[in-house]
Amino acid sequence: MAVLWRLSAVCGAQGGRALLLRTPVVRPAHISAFLQDRPIPEWCGVQHIHLSPGHHSGSKAASLHWTSERVVSVLLLGLLPAAYLNPCSAMDYSLAATLTLHGHWGLGQVVTDYVHGDASQKAAKAGLLALSALTFAGLCYFNYHDVGICKAVAMLWKL
């Protein structure tokens, strides 16, 4: 209540109420009957939010990509204890695939957010793809020709 009083002192008698209760996002249904449709003073700093039209929103592929990123993250949460409890070659290759994919998608978001310009972004994404492919190939080589990821981590813990 003190916040509403403070806003009304700053924005005028109806400003605080208009700021907090006239927007459909915040206004409860039982309060809307008591509010009158008065124009909101522009000097109070109230702005209307315009949502982007449906045809400008992301594609279905972006939604599936986001969902698959979450699935891989949850899969890693289950794979790590399972690999500790049951170290075998299937776990080693599963970890190699999911860790590489998780790292590739995470670093891809870093490239998207922080690398600017078309040419440099394409070069960074190509370098990331090469790094991810080499990482996966190296982990698979390590799993096939050496002790594997699970046993290597266990050996590191014994040190």
Swiss-Prot record:
<keyword id="KW-0349">Heme</keyword>
<keyword id="KW-0479">Metal-binding</keyword>
<feature type="binding site">
    <location>
        <position position="114"/>
    </location>
    <ligand>
        <name>a ubiquinone</name>
    </ligand>
</feature>
<dbReference type="GO" id="GO:0020037">
    <property type="term" value="F:heme binding"/>
</dbReference>
<keyword id="KW-0809">Transit peptide</keyword>
<feature type="transmembrane region" description="Helical">
    <location>
        <begin position="64"/>
        <end position="85"/>
    </location>
</feature>
<dbReference type="Pfam" id="PF05328">
    <property type="entry name" value="CybS"/>
</dbReference>
<dbReference type="GO" id="GO:0045273">
    <property type="term" value="C:respiratory chain complex II (succinate dehydrogenase)"/>
</dbReference>
<keyword id="KW-0813">Transport</keyword>
<dbReference type="GO" id="GO:0006099">
    <property type="term" value="P:tricarboxylic acid cycle"/>
</dbReference>
<feature type="topological domain" description="Mitochondrial matrix">
    <location>
        <begin position="57"/>
        <end position="63"/>
    </location>
</feature>
<comment type="pathway">
    <text>Carbohydrate metabolism; tricarboxylic acid cycle.</text>
</comment>
<dbReference type="GO" id="GO:0048039">
    <property type="term" value="F:ubiquinone binding"/>
</dbReference>
<comment type="similarity">
    <text>Belongs to the CybS family.</text>
</comment>
<feature type="topological domain" description="Mitochondrial matrix">
    <location>
        <begin position="112"/>
        <end position="120"/>
    </location>
</feature>
<protein>
    <recommendedName>
        <fullName>Succinate dehydrogenase [ubiquinone] cytochrome b small subunit, mitochondrial</fullName>
    </recommendedName>
</protein>
<keyword id="KW-0408">Iron</keyword>
<dbReference type="InterPro" id="IPR034804">
    <property type="entry name" value="SQR/QFR_C/D"/>
</dbReference>
<keyword id="KW-0496">Mitochondrion</keyword>
<feature type="transmembrane region" description="Helical">
    <location>
        <begin position="91"/>
        <end position="111"/>
    </location>
</feature>
<keyword id="KW-0249">Electron transport</keyword>
<feature type="topological domain" description="Mitochondrial intermembrane">
    <location>
        <begin position="86"/>
        <end position="90"/>
    </location>
</feature>
<comment type="subunit">
    <text>Component of complex II composed of four subunits: the flavoprotein (FP) SDHA, iron-sulfur protein (IP) SDHB, and a cytochrome b560 composed of SDHC and SDHD.</text>
</comment>
<keyword id="KW-0816">Tricarboxylic acid cycle</keyword>
<keyword id="KW-0999">Mitochondrion inner membrane</keyword>
<keyword id="KW-1133">Transmembrane helix</keyword>
<comment type="function">
    <text>Membrane-anchoring subunit of succinate dehydrogenase (SDH) that is involved in complex II of the mitochondrial electron transport chain and is responsible for transferring electrons from succinate to ubiquinone (coenzyme Q). SDH also oxidizes malate to the non-canonical enol form of oxaloacetate, enol-oxaloacetate. Enol-oxaloacetate, which is a potent inhibitor of the succinate dehydrogenase activity, is further isomerized into keto-oxaloacetate.</text>
</comment>
<dbReference type="GO" id="GO:0006121">
    <property type="term" value="P:mitochondrial electron transport, succinate to ubiquinone"/>
</dbReference>
<dbReference type="InterPro" id="IPR007992">
    <property type="entry name" value="CybS"/>
</dbReference>
<feature type="transit peptide" description="Mitochondrion">
    <location>
        <begin position="1"/>
        <end position="56"/>
    </location>
</feature>
<dbReference type="GO" id="GO:0005743">
    <property type="term" value="C:mitochondrial inner membrane"/>
</dbReference>
<keyword id="KW-0472">Membrane</keyword>
<feature type="binding site" description="axial binding residue">
    <location>
        <position position="102"/>
    </location>
    <ligand>
        <name>heme b</name>
    </ligand>
</feature>
<feature type="transmembrane region" description="Helical">
    <location>
        <begin position="121"/>
        <end position="142"/>
    </location>
</feature>
<dbReference type="GO" id="GO:0046872">
    <property type="term" value="F:metal ion binding"/>
</dbReference>
<feature type="topological domain" description="Mitochondrial intermembrane">
    <location>
        <begin position="143"/>
        <end position="159"/>
    </location>
</feature>
<keyword id="KW-0812">Transmembrane</keyword>
